[in-house]
Amino acid sequence: MKNLKKIIRIALENDWIKKDPFAYYRFKLEETDPEFLTMDEIKIILAKEFTIKRVEQVRDIFVFCIFTGLAFSDVKDLSPEHLVKDNKGELWIRKNRQKTKIMCNIPVLPVAASILDKYKDVVECTGKLLPVLCNQRMNSYLKEIADVCGIHKNLSTHTARHSYATSICLANGVSMENVAKMLGHADTSVTKHYARVLDQNIFKDMQKVNSCLSELAI
């Protein structure tokens, strides 16, 4: 829809059309729930051993995205200059998002730090922190990883980012405001959507508990 509006605007500016054909229409986009991994699914991927080096690397990059919330373009662009230590010696990722140019400030959790350490001397990482493939190849390997791990979800770097927001942050009590800052969101409107999805999943789980306990009474 955004691309269509852009084309209409360019056509109007160049007098290719006389008026906006959609001027009196208001489109309401239907919200879709972002897919994310549960903590149990994340642990399965972490524990899985891969014999093929390239698949292992893709798993590591995917896990790094889960524990930092970085989008594909940002993790591919990640270089030593984006790593900063604060006055307490804690490691942070500080960089502008490729998509929005908004600064994101992300504390480097132990899992992410161990992945950075694992690839610090890898030749493929010259000038960059991690050996990131092109998006198409990475998503192809992620399908293979999902199959091997028995996870029936469409794994992508988007899934990793959603998992960071929900399972890593919001589920562990991180405020929406802080999640928004770490993800590089302009405000909390998108973050609130993650929180709503998380609430829905909690409710579904509690319904299962309720059905198991339904026969109990005092």
Question: Residue locations for each model-derived region?
Answer:
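Basic, Lys/Arg- and aromatic-enriched nucleic-acid-binding interface segment
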Residues: 13-72
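Conserved tyrosine-mediated DNA breakage-rejoining catalytic core shared by Y-recombinases
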Residues: 26-35, 41, 77-115
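C-terminal catalytic core of Y-nucleophile DNA break-rejoin enzymes
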Residues: 31, 98-117, 123-144
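Catalytic-site neighborhood detector that most strongly recognizes the C-terminal catalytic loop/helix
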Residues: 36, 97-101, 113, 135, ...
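Short basic/aromatic active-site micro-motif
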Residues: 57-58, 132-136, 152-172
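C-terminal catalytic core of tyrosine-transesterase DNA break-rejoin enzymes
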Residues: 63, 67, 73-74, 144, ...
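Short, polar N-cap/turn motifs at the start of nucleic acid-interacting alpha helices
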Residues: 82-89, 152-153, 173-193, 200, ...
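C-terminal secondary-structure termini that scaffold catalytic or DNA-interacting sites
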Residues: 122, 209-218
